[in-house]
Amino acid sequence: MLGVFATSIAAMLLATPALAQDRVPVAGATGTITGRLTEALKETPVVGAVVRVVGQEVATQSDSSGRFTLRGVRVGIVTIEVRRLGFAPVTKGNIAVSPAKPAEVSVVLRPIDVQLDAVTVRPEAFPAQMAASTPVSTQTYDAEEVRRQPGAQEDVLRAVSIAPGVGVTSGGRNDLIVRGGAPFENLFVVDNIEVPNINHFGSQGSTGGPVSLVNIRFIESASLSAGGFGARLGDRTSSATILTLREGNRERIAGELNVAATQYGAVIEGPLGKNASFFVNVRKSYLDLLFKALGFSFIPSYEDATAKVVWRPTKRDAFSFLTIVARGSISFDNSTDSGRVTNSQVVNPGQDQYFSGLTWKRLLSRGVATTTLGRTWTRYATSQRDSLLVPVLDSRSTEGENTLRTDITWLAGRGVEIETGTIFKYASDLRYDATLAGFTRRDARGNPQPLRVDTSFTALRNGTYLQATWQAQPRLRLSVGARNDWYGFLDNAVRFSPRVSASLRVDPVTTLTLAGGRYYQAPSYIWLVGDPQNAERLKPFRADQAVAGVTRLVGSDIKVQLEVYGKRYGDYPARRFRPQAVLSPSGFDDATTDIPLGLEPLESTATGNAFGIELFAQKKFGASPFYGQLSTSLNRTRFTGINGTATRGAFDSPVTANGVLGWRPNSKWEIATRLRGATGLPFTPFVSAGSLAGTLDFTRYNTERVGTFLAADLRVDRRFIMRRTQFIAFLDLQNFTNRQNQQAPVWNPRTRMADTNPSIGLFPSIGLNLEF
């Protein structure tokens, strides 16, 4: 395999002259940039702004709708600068200009006092102020930063995992560990639709999985807030990831054919009349071919489809519709004894799912109102069999939920911004049919407690918020908010969550930030059916957070940020059969070693805390051909279960570090590398003898750690530019040093001993993308 990929690298290198050639694109190759300028908060069009391409003699002005078109732009990755009297100038980089189709961008301009010193008003690559909903601990990545991430395998969640304070559970999954919290504590919002899980083969009751179902080519921006977010975002205690998908291009019909790390697909997009656009994408995996070639006895397969339509009938109204449909399954080859033994330790997470939403955005005289009607639906077919093909776990369930939310932003005058809104969620289709063998579900004394449940119910809840932000002085910004959540399915529980934040600009390049608040989260629906009393014992759990930080700009395209944080958990789900532990599902847990999916007696009595410090530095791509970022996090996480003893959290990783360095020498080539390191996660050793051999020994809960995680990734992109077509080839080497990081040991039923569990090591992939 290594020989094949070495040959591929050589072929790419020989396809063009040396990298050190002049940084000028193919002669005569040009493209178009189209976009829209809006005013921050009000989202009204910005008319008459000058938009120019940095380093090229191409410029234009925005029209009465705030739209602009830049033609004759040399192909490659470019930066535009936007200036308008009364607004802070903005630069927007990483715009990929192609001869095949227009690059569509959106730029938000912030009003300023025209009397401010001119020397302090300069174009910057980073927002001067954070949004009230994400005042601290937030990193935003544009489309190109997400796409080109080394080792991400074109997965948006792996791409944003480089943010400070964020880790992953293992190399083969994208579950996000944010400041010591469990993956189920993370919120995901796609085009204003809250989605329980955006992954193929997603973990039921949690948020992670092996591969995202959101196509990375449609990402306009991806923001991850690691904590301290405002009152608009709720029902999660750790983080919020907000994905904004771009519109289809409005110039002409265009398409793409692509092959990526694990799938191939096609895209078509273009205008629908004068005021509308669309895109449609279908993808199918070829993992079945890879797994068969590598000799695996279990063969995963998935496919998905994405469609989005945007219609702007007037200057004040915009409608958008998004839908993503996906399905995934795993087939097993049980023709050999070794295959049956291997398959007996693999959970089959078959899933069919979709989410969709219709959004209406209306510009008001001094603000904007947004209403979204959405639905999420997933059908799970989770199963596991032992080496004799006897069922161990069989869980078939459906979770369907309808959502209606309205958000209003209003400029009240005198520097005051008001944000308010409400969200109703009605889970109209909750059905669970689960069977769990007794030997996999033992109580604290080791007695088998088999489970058989067949039930259905509905759930209604509401969250309403109000937040006021005051620009008290040109350099001081204060925000106070509150959120009230009602959970009809949890005995009509009501929870009140205050939030506060402050931002002080000490000088033109230095800003101090502070945020704090209370955050509540409802237990996952499947946890309620793990025991007849769970619905009575479980209640919303909480996290009180405080974050303080300082951010300094070192030039217009370099940012350095230092933050300290603390979290204190209460009413966290504790495990009655495992009194030492709190609930912390993290993926395809082997049902033969511990109880899966939270199908066990739980109660809201656990507590916990997490503290840490993070250092983050980022350089955007600009005049220099280099870009990169570096983050280092120190963290300590502890939880206390029913037994009253504080122990390491399941996702306690004291040291996490990420580094990315990229070089774009010309319009054809790009080379980037990523270094990742983290303290190994805790694990619980196995009982090694007796009738309980092969089960986890919770008397030694999380007393061991796997080895330090280290990985280095490399990505090389090559663009081939033709008259009306662009072809992009890339080579992505995940863990190119072939280091086999250790994961938690697995139990070998043949030897009745714990085996080491190394990761796959080097994972190379080639990607091809044809734009036409």
Identify the function of each model-found stretch.
Residues 17-127, 134, 470, 475:
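Periplasm-facing N-terminal accessory domains of Gram-negative outer-membrane beta-barrel systems
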Residues 260-284, 296-330, 348-375, 410-416:
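Transmembrane beta-barrel wall of Gram-negative outer-membrane proteins
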Residues 401-407, 452-458, 463, 539, ...:
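Outer membrane beta-barrel strand-and-loop segments of large Gram-negative receptors
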Residues 570, 622, 677-693, 707-711, ...:
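C-terminal beta-signal and adjacent terminal beta-strands/loops
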